[in-house]
Curated annotation (Swiss-Prot):
GO terms for molecular function: catalytic activity, acting on a protein; histidine-tRNA ligase activity; transferase activity. The keyword Ribonucleoprotein does not apply. It is found in: Cytoplasm. It comes from Bacillus cereus (strain ATCC 14579 / DSM 31 / CCUG 7414 / JCM 2152 / NBRC 15305 / NCIMB 9373 / NCTC 2599 / NRRL B-3711). Gene3D superfamilies: Bira Bifunctional Protein, Domain 2. InterPro entries: aa-tRNA-synth_II, aa-tRNA-synth_II/BPL/LPL, HisRS-like_core, HisRS/HisZ, HisZ. HAMAP family: HisZ (MF_00125). This is ATP phosphoribosyltransferase regulatory subunit. Heteromultimer composed of HisG and HisZ subunits. NCBIfam families: hisZ_biosyn_reg, PRK12292.1-6. CDD domains: HisRS-like_core (cd00773). Pfam families: tRNA-synt_His (PF13393).
Amino acid sequence: MTKWKRANPNGTRDYLFEECTLIEEVEQKLRLTFLERGYEEIRTPTIEFYDVFAFQNRPIDEEKMYKFFDEKGRIIVLRPDMTIPLARVIGTQRWDTPLKVTYSGNVFRANESHSGKYNEIVQSGIEVIGIDNVRAEIECVISVIQALQKLKVQSFTIEIGQVQLYKCIVKKLSIQDEEERVLRTYIESKNYAALSNFIGEKKLDRCDETVRLLEKLPRLFGNLEVIEEAEKLASSNEMKMAIARVKEMYETIEMLGYGSYISIDLGMIQHLDYYTGVIFKGYIYEIGEEIVSGGRYDELIGNFGEMLPAVGLAVQVNQIVKALQEQQEPYERNQIDIVIHYELNRLAEAERLRNLLRKDGKNAWLSLFSNLSDTFQFARKNKIGTVVEAQNEYLVEYVWNEKWVVQKEGEASCVTFKLR
């Protein structure tokens, strides 16, 4: 029964000290950036009913959910996604739109063992509800670019795709569900040979414009030249409108001076089926994992109530932290300047002295040791050069000079006690 008591479950880990601090700092900077842009905060429970995620098309595989039962025998899950619970909140209440919301929290997915993915991650994100025009997508992309800039993330790119274009191609070529899932993996992985074999096995006419567009799809990534190629092969108004939306987004964001942070990838297809239009993925060159994901999901909220257009994105906080650790100087824990040793009856005076020193910019630390010799040993181990002792009647300052020597003594009150 105690076999696993010293281990973490697969896909989880402990976060310690400076890494924990960095996670909190990243979350807070993202939060403040989004609040400055007019987003309002929403928090949803860590646990949700399984039914929240079990609607048509099952956007999240059942096998990836952590499931258990509540006191009434109902199936509960640890939330595997942040957007779907938010859609539940929006869909089950009446709101004045447009609505801009932000969130942050942990997400849980049971990934395959040895996949290299963590089963518990931290996400911070934004959603724009009730707007169906391209301004909503532009707002999301600009917001996340500014947030990443404030975090001083280097060498990142936000890729813009269009899942509606892919869906139009699949529909026009009458590709069925099972085949579509296979096709999706070929395009996403840019497996040109497998895609060509798929087209051959399906006996699709390679002279047909839509088939040619399908075969080119994994190669359509880069700048506006990609849009021009796609436009030449678009065989329906719906395809042309989908491509035009990406073009309008790209041109507008470029005009605002953020062109170096964006690129186009029409072969990008999100793994979550609830996306209906423009989609986003963000990457940092130093790490292979995505740091941003999202897109438009105009049909999702309708599963819970009124049908409302929406677009949003999530920032993968853990991946941001990983990148910052690689890009920046090693994190240094706050150096303690002074340790205050005290008798218990002098704790109030020691606390007042600590507060006074902190106001003067000193990092003062109350000793947890009852013996002065132990406090001295702690100070030396942590390269702290000053110890103040609050004795029964007065304060004593010690400094390290090859040994601990008295620098000053005699003051009874911390108000009059001044360090050298």
